[in-house]
């Protein structure tokens, strides 16, 4: 049986990376929430 998680750094960054978050209004809201919460790491 094939596992569902097949890691790829490029895919990870393109979907969850900082620049991907900054590209949309909602993504910027995600970063703002994580900053407000005090997350050490904002994005992948």
Swiss-Prot record:
Query: Gene3D superfamilies from the entry?
Result: 1.10.287.3980
One of the Pfam families matching this protein, by short name? Ribosomal_L34
Name the Gene Ontology molecular function terms of this record. structural constituent of ribosome
Entry GO CC? ribonucleoprotein complex; ribosome
State the Gene Ontology BP annotations: translation
Domain of life, per lineage: Bacteria
* PROSITE patterns assigned: RIBOSOMAL_L34
Q: Which UniProt keywords apply?
A: Ribonucleoprotein, Ribosomal protein
Q: Which HAMAP family match?
A: Ribosomal_bL34
The entry assigns this protein to a family as follows: Belongs to the bacterial ribosomal protein bL34 family.
What is the protein name for this chain?
A: Large ribosomal subunit protein bL34
Native source species: Histophilus somni (strain 2336)
Question: Which gene codes for it?
Answer: rpmH
């Amino acid at each position: 049986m094939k596992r569902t998680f097949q890691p790829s750094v490029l895919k990870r960054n393109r979907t969850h990376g900082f620049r991907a978050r900054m590209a949309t209004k909602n993504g910027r809201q995600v970063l703002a929430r994580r900053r407000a919460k005090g997350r050490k790491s904002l994005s992948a």
